[in-house]
Swiss-Prot record:
Similarity-based family: Belongs to the acetaldehyde dehydrogenase family.
GO molecular function, one term: NAD binding
Active site positions, chain numbering: C129
UniProt entry tagged with the keyword Oxidoreductase: yes
Enzyme Commission (EC) number: 1.2.1.10
The protein's name in its UniProt record: Acetaldehyde dehydrogenase 1
Classification via InterPro entries: Acetaldehyde_dehydrogenase (IPR003361), Acetylaldehyde_DH_C (IPR015426), NAD(P)-bd_dom_sf (IPR036291), Semialdehyde_DH_NAD-bd (IPR000534)
A Pfam family matched in the record: Semialdhyde_dh
GO BP term, pick one: catabolic process
Catalytic activity of the protein: acetaldehyde + NAD(+) + CoA = acetyl-CoA + NADH + H(+)
Keywords in alphabetical order: Aromatic hydrocarbons catabolism, NAD, Oxidoreductase
Residues at which NAD(+) binds: S11, G12, N13, I14, S160, A161, G162, P163, G164, T165, R166, A167, N168, N290
Amino acid sequence: MSTTKVAVIGSGNIGTDLVIKLEQVAKNVEIAVLVGIDPASDGLARARRLGISTVDTGVQGLIEHPEFDDIEIIFDSTSAKAHLTNAEALRPYGKHLIDLTPAAIGPYVVPAVNLDQHLGAPDVNMVTCGGQATIPIVAAISKVTDVHYAEIVASIASKSAGPGTRANIDEFTETTAKAIEEVGGAAHGKAIIVLNPADPPLIMRDTVLALVSNPDQDAIRQSITDMVATVAAYVPGYRLKQDVQFTELGGADTVATLTGGADIGSPVWKVSVFLEVEGAAHYLPAYAGNLDIMTSAALQVAEKLAERTALEIAR
């Protein structure tokens, strides 16, 4: 099968990590152009050393690039605000956009949960790094029982957070919380991000707390174990940090402020899941699991899109 050409907009940490993945591990897609706005950026310099065409004049420079017509998929790893502008500029050209910012113009996609549901959408959103790590766990619990409330805490090394991530903290929490509900299946969702300043940096760690009623503990454990294996198939450094924990909290009134006062039955239990994500160190060191899970998930979507396009052509 011939490969599908792609472009990456954004030459920061996420964009550069994605470019290296496209060079080293992609099967059905190939990088044609890396787009940035700073001619001196490390990402553009690395791409040039790899023999990849670069543009330092933003999305307009991409549109004017001689290979633009051959490009079918465009990753945007800039910022939520920039993606709004980029998507508008690219809309007339019918390209598939994979949005790695919290802009969320299009539907949320978490490959382990709903990869096949939105492949026809012109612009799909990869939620956030914290969402990619934790929403599969919320969805795994939701398969077994109703999740009345889910809260996630994503702790990432400060050194792995570039200016785009730092500019999008509010969007991170809002987008992740919505996706916990829409993709994860929780009735109510909340997200918190922590930029850990520890030096040497620690790998990404994520906590998922879910409120459920009368849980089948063995079934929930098995569902979570199965989901971790599904995610680890494309993010090898993704794993449970310790055993899933169950804590009885009492009556529904004890958590009414979190569940909107809904009648959720008693007793209410808290399910606690602790994860860590070790990066593949394609660009930043292994502590940057937040980059790895985001770019690996986006690559999964691109590979699936390329497969679907090839099948359509073959018919």
